[in-house]
């Protein structure tokens, strides 16, 4: 069943942290819907800015949003104009004070969402799916990945019956919890319908941080 579980959720609390860092009792549903609105707005507004992860933190009446992107210049804009417009829009959307932090992705070829999104955009441009997968895997391996697996599902090449094509290079140890595996699921809108693109990238092992236990002799 290790092939079925979401690799990101499987590693939360071991080597991964939550993308939403807040706690609420009575307002949980309200905050959750607010998070979904924020993520949907950012992903729509910055569709061409290679945005990967969006982290949301909350403190009192303040919302801190960290946007991980491969194109920080496009998000920030000339003199910070674009990010300021985005901040104002999120302020109006949530009715709270929003602070935006831009985090640059140094190696976009090691980010599963950006790689999967690249494959999806190629499929929409009618590039052969095997070629799109092969080129993406080669770029990722050259960038320093230990392994990559890509899966494309749907009416490939407009076939009447949908099928799944999986290609892999290197190793992708899904059962090893200390393995840093980035996972993403993306969609390609083609003339024959939607194609699903799944991407797993193994970036090496991460040793979980051990808790410091300084107690001695029953103290």
UniProtKB/Swiss-Prot annotation:
Signal peptide range: none
One Pfam family of this chain: KH_2
Annotated keywords: Ribonucleoprotein, Ribosomal protein, RNA-binding, rRNA-binding
Membrane-spanning ranges: none
Coiled-coil boundaries: none
Domain KH type-2: 38-106
GO molecular function, one term: structural constituent of ribosome
Cellular component annotations (GO), alphabetically ordered: cytosolic small ribosomal subunit
Protein name as catalogued: Small ribosomal subunit protein uS3
Organism name: Latilactobacillus sakei subsp. sakei (strain 23K)
């Amino acid at each position: 069943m290790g092939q079925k579980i979401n690799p990101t959720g499987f590693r939360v609390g071991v080597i991964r942290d939550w993308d939403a860092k807040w706690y609420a009792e009575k307002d949980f549903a309200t905050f959750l819907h607010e998070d979904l609105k924020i993520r949907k707005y950012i992903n729509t507004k910055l569709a061409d800015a290679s945005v990967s992860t969006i982290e949301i933190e909350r403190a009192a009446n303040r919302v801190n949003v960290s946007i991980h992107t491969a194109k920080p210049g496009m998000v920030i804009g000339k003199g910070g104009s674009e990010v300021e417009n985005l901040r104002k829009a999120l302020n109006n959307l949530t009715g709270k004070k929003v602070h935006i932090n831009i985090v640059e992705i140094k190696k976009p070829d090691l980010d599963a969402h950006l790689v999967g999104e690249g494959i999806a955009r190629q499929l929409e441009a009618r590039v052969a799916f095997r070629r799109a997968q092969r080129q993406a895997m080669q770029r990722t391996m050259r960038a320093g990945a230990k392994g990559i697996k890509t899966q494309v599902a749907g009416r490939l090449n407009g076939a009447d019956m949908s099928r799944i094509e999986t290609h892999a290079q290197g190793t992708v140890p899904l059962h090893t919890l200390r393995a840093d595996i980035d996972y993403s699921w993306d969609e390609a809108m083609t003339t024959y319908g939607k194609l699903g693109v799944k991407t797993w990238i193994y970036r090496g092992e991460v040793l979980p941080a051990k808790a410091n236990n300084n107690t001695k002799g029953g103290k």
